[in-house]
Structure formats: C-alpha cells, structure tokens
Amino acid sequence: MIRRLEELVRQCNVDDYRIVECTTVSHQAFFVKQDLDQHRISDTTHVTLFLYVDKEEDGRKLRGQASREFYESQSDEEILKQIESMKFQASLAMNPYFEIPADYKYAEERKDYKLLDVLKTLVSAIQNVKDTKTEKINSYELFVNEYYYHIVNSRGVDVSFNTMDEEAEVIINSIDGDHEIELYHRVKFANQPLNEITDGILEVFRYAKDRTKAKPTKKMNNATVLMTSLDNGDFFRYFLAKTNAGMVYNRRSQTKVGDDCQENSKGDKVTLELKKELPYSANNLPFTTEGVPAKDITIVKDGVYQSYWGDQKNSYYLGLKEAIPANNYVVLPGSKSIAEMKQDPYLEIIQFSSFIMNPMTGDFGGEIRLAYYFDGKEVTPVTGGSITCNMTESLKHIYLSKETRQINNCVVPKTVQIFDVAVAGEE
C-alpha cells in the first residue's frame, strides 16, 4: 500500500509528503483471578499520509500540512480525490516554513519476537505470585505487541524497523477485617526478566497490606519528604518539558541553553541524558515516525541546561541542526543512600492517587495514597493528605539516592529527598 500511495501522491503536485505505515500484531490475555477468561489476537495495518503545501506571503515562505489515513480497499480515483481535498485543507492553515528530514536510509531485518511465547512468560511471572490470607489478585490484563514501521518521504527518507512492548495491568485486593482496599498496578516494558516482573507485583502486595493498616496523614510544616514512587519518572520529566523545542518556541518555557536551574543550591545536581536504547525499555525506536534518528545526548548536566530536543518543525524554528527525540532518559544517581536519607524524621511517599507536575509553573504534588512516616522512633504507614511543592524552590535543596530504578523508558534515582515541604493532612 505504501508504494501505491507514494506513486499517487506524486501525481498531485504537492511540495513534500511523508507516509507512515504501521503494522501492529497484538496478543492479549484477560484473567479473572488466575483463570484465563479470554485470549485475543489482532493484526492491523494503518497507513497515514502527511502532505505539505507551500506558498509565499508578504515575502515570507509558509507551509501548511494535512494528514489522513488511507486503506487498501480504496480505489485510485478515491485516493486522488482525497489527496486534492487534503491540499486544500493544508492551504487554510499556514505556518512558517520548515524542512522535513532528508536522506536517511535504514532497513532493519524484521525480528521474530515470538509473541505467544513472550505472553506465556508474562503469565508465568504473574502466576508465580501466590495469594495470601489477606492479599489476592483480583484480575489482570496482559498485552504483548509488535510494531512494524515503514516510513518514506519526498526527501529521500526510507526507513523500516520493528519493535515490541509488553504491558500488564493488575488489580490487587487487600483485606484487614472489615476493611478492604483495591490497588491498581500498571507496568510497561520489553523483555524484562521474569523475576523482576514477579518482584514488582509482590512489592505491591506489601504496600496493599500496609495500606489497610494506614493511619491518616498528619498536617506538617517544613517536613522532609522522600519520594520513592513510580511517579519519579514524571518528576524528572520536568526537565524534558523545560527543554522541549515546542514548549520553548511557543514561549511556554523560558529556558535557554546555559541556564543553571540549581545555581547556589545545596545537595545534588541533576544530570539527565537522553538514550537511544535502554535495556527493557518499550521505547527503543531507532527512528521517529517523522524519520528522525534517535541519538544519545545530554540535556542537563550538573543543573545546567545543555540542549533542546523535540520534533522536526519546532527544532527547525529554533535553528537547531537536527531534531532529537526523547525515547529514553537516564538521571544519574546522587550522593546519598536511601538508608542515609532515613536517619532523621521523614515522610516517605510510595504512591500518589494522582501525581501532577506543571512544567510551566514548576508546581507539583498530589494526594497521598500510601506513605510511611518516621517520627524519629518508629515508622507508621499513613494515607490521605497531600503535598504541594514548587520545582524552583525544591531544586535549591535536594538529594538524589545512590540507588536507581527503571520505570519503563527511564532510569531515575529510586528516592528523591526534598525539604521544607508543607503537608496537608489531619489536624
């Protein structure tokens, strides 16, 4: 279909085009408790055309674009008619001119991921988790997907590759007398070792047990907070948002390369690197669907912004030599062990009901689903209440743990220590 569509669009006098073909093969399994309820297999192909129309206005070169999906069942006449309609749509919304990627050639031999075998391994990992008297698996859904991409454009890009990912969604119930709670656990990865998948669910079992015994969070001023949450990945995405070419071009971020976001700060300096590949990541794509190659690059080094990243259009607007995707990222570990962080009183947040990070204002926080409070003598599980912080203030005094953890496409410090936090809670 992709070659046929390319031949047809060449007949329509467009200035540039890009075609993306994505075939997705998916194995899905749905379990009630540990019993298989349904197994589904799907195989779908989507072909999307992006076309670009240029014109000059008041001495400025402009470019409009439009996109739509096409199907094998469509006739040539129908496709040509829709392409002409797309050209008209593109001409109605013109933006400053930008170039599309050019001259990338990449043809990767299609890998056989043996999806059914991968699914069986994933099932085994979860069935290794045995119910206890108080903690039980309610249900779970598993997805194992292969994606085959073929991308061509009018500037000589012709790349093809395939990749895969796995996803597990598990609901766990925990009962303590008449009190029952439910926890939702969702993870995404690729080829993660079986024991690590099992250990992740067992960890949620332990947290579920503690949640049923949790006391209300007390109101605190100037608390030391340890963030040991799966939301730590989103915490560090703040730095990606601040350096995103689209955010910068549209003036939603004022960040400039060379700015020091931790000038005169105490504690650890943040270093964040983009990685083309990361073991067990579901985002190991050699190219974006724009036809831009992935690469390794440092975005922040010791608190100083080093580079922007982003899509082709906004990178071109900023005058960057090339667009850089953020498939995977790594935040380097800090100077303190978690044990050192726990020597003095703290509130360690394990789960938020919903973690929110506003990269424009730097505000972040959320309602506490499960945390552990250490008063200097004993540790008590707590729930409820919330924290509200600001990144600019938090970066003035912050420590990152020596220990790291991988959360799908990122490796980040397992615990982040921040200070002077106002905790809303029970009086």
Placement of each model-derived feature along the sequence:
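Dual-mode signal for accessory low-complexity, basic/Gly-rich regions
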Residues: 259-427
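Active-site bordering "gate/hinge" segments
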Residues: 1-277, 302, 414-427
